[in-house]
From Swiss-Prot:
Gene3D superfamilies tied to this protein: alpha/beta hydrolase
Protein name as catalogued: Carboxymethylenebutenolidase homolog
Annotated keywords: Cytoplasm, Hydrolase
Pfam families assigned to the protein according to its UniProt record, in alphabetical order: DLH
Native species: Xenopus laevis
Predominant place of localization: cytoplasm
Function, in words: Cysteine hydrolase.
Amino acid sequence: MANEACPCPCDIGDKFEYGAKGQEIQIEHIKAYVSKPHSSTDKAVIVVQDIFGWQLPNTRFMADLLTAHGYITICPDFFVGQESWKPSNDWSTFTEWLQTRQATKVEKEMNVVLKYLKEQCHVKKIGVIGFCWGGVVTHHLMLKYPELKAGVSFYGIIRDVEDRYNLLNPTLFIFAEIDHVIPLEQVSLLEQKLKVHSKVDFQIKVFPKQTHGFVHRKKEDINPEDKPFIEEARKDMLEWLQKYIN
């Protein structure tokens, strides 16, 4: 569990024991996990990791879930070979560690991923989802890349960028009620500002009694009381992507 010395409660939750269905590939200077459906498609979703990195089984489970619904999915190593965070690390060093992995400086890698999807996979419609650190990345990308048809940000929010409310395409923000990193006051402010500034569709949804990471870091069979919320959030993600990536 997170404690007062822990600036990010991402260690709350479970690491899935999961055998991924896709494969790891090299795309120019970055590695990526890619999962493809049996039938051909021109739709893809970029899945952005949390602080535990692109190889976390939980994240690959979510990528494969999307693939099962007909999308090519790709989970790139946005840390570009830098070590991911480990629950056993000293949390007092987290802020320093994070400074070398800034969620708003991923354009170089993003451009490589988009080129791969368009040229190698013949994709025409692209969305993005992300968790925690990746949720911040998703928020950032939805401000910068008009070709991203839809975004789903899980428990991630940009706090310090002036134009963070000018979304380019529809974005769903999913938060947990009990999240010490993202207090509900910040969620309310985001919603108020988006109502004023956003010219595209958006939705903000807060799930009661849930903690940071609940959509991809909790196991339904271990936490049966959380199962309806986990399933609902995943359903919301799928419906949002289906609505706007068509």
